[in-house]
Amino acid sequence: MEDSGNSSGSEASRSGSEERRPVRERLGSRPPERRPVRARLGAIRRRRGGRGGRAARQALRQRRRQQQQQQRQQQHQRRRQEADRPDGGPDAPPDRLSESARAAVSATHARVGATRVNELFASARHDLSRPVFNDGFRAAGSSPWAAVLEFGAEQFTPDGRRVTWETLMFHGADLHRLFEVRPHATEAARVLREMVLLNEGLTESLASADETLTWVKLILTKGLTLRTLDPIVATAGAVLQNLRLKLGPFLRCYLRDTPVDELVRRRRLRDVRCIVTYTLVMLARIARVVERGSSCVLPEDLGDSPVPLEEYVPGACLGGIMDALDSHKTGCDAPTCRLTCSYTLVPVYMHGKYFYCNHLF
């Protein structure tokens, strides 16, 4: 009994003396694997040189990150250079025409001649004589849209189709309904409208941009569904494509801060600075909804305004962009901009084509 009392007393004495020892000595007396994590890390830091060693390690890590970043940039630049080469890179096989490609190109002159050209034009005219079956849209004779919904009945003239905003608000729902209940005619209308839009001149293309934005504003204002199968909505991308082509030389100088490719790709409302950028961004936002396969364009696809396209006035695309061309022509320092803007507005041939050589017909 006395021995057990003495042993318990000695253990208490040792534990008390252990607690009175400095923390570093107590931890140092334990095996490394039994020390707390913080103590082990502290010991490692002390062995590596304390705070000075930590700064050196941070500098080393920073140098390694910089080296890795430089290597990634060099690899990216090397890949871009290889992609820009016609042969695809130093290890790619020689870039040359295959024998079948040579034969196909050489055989063109034996297959195509004056007779063949006349035949294909006649065939195309025949196909366009009946572009749609089931009598097209079959609009009632009393409908204000009956004449314009005919296929190939008459040539389009802007003044012949001019309507007021009030007239559109009154009769627009009827056209919207016909686009929905005549799917076969609507499909043909989408195809033909796209072909027409891609072949328009600048003035006609700007009027088509106004037609698109006016229609979108009308449908959303009336609370109707803006379907992406609607011929006017579905072809917003064609309007945008043709405008970028017709305005391309002007836009390269006019949009120096934000190139048109970047402007259209980002489609950000905060990039809008004028009617030119407004038209491009709005058409791009509509076209994007169509491209991703959505069934309809929602008001929030065009912005967070409680009134869709509240700031847009029908005709702003045509009038505003023509005014921007003239203003840029008189204000730009580039010596060629005067010619560029003038020809964009009035595309009459003056110079540029030098010969025409045709051994086929």
Curated annotation (Swiss-Prot):
This is mRNA export factor ICP27 homolog. Residues 16-36, 80-99 have a biased composition (Basic and acidic residues). InterPro entries: ICP27-like (IPR008648). It holds the Pfam family Herpes_UL69. One of its GO terms (cellular component) is host cell nucleus. GO terms for molecular function: RNA binding; zinc ion binding. Residues 1-107 are annotated as: Disordered. Homodimer. Homodimerization is required for transactivation. Associates in a complex with RNA, and host export factors NXF1/TAP and ALYREF; these interactions allow nuclear export of viral transcripts. Interacts with three host shuttling SR proteins SRSF1, SRSF3 and SRSF7. Interacts with host SRPK1. Interacts with IE62; this interaction enhances IE62 transactivation. Belongs to the HHV-1 ICP27 protein family. Keywords: Activator, Early protein, Host cytoplasm, Host nucleus, Host-virus interaction, Metal-binding, RNA-binding, Transcription, Transcription regulation, Zinc, Zinc-finger. Zn(2+) binds at C253, H328, C332, C337. It is found in: Host cytoplasm; Host nucleus. One of its GO terms (biological process) is regulation of DNA-templated transcription. A zinc finger (CHC2-type) spans 253-337. Residues 45-54 are annotated as: RGG-box. The lineage of its organism: Viruses, Duplodnaviria, Heunggongvirae, Peploviricota, Herviviricetes. It comes from the Viruses.
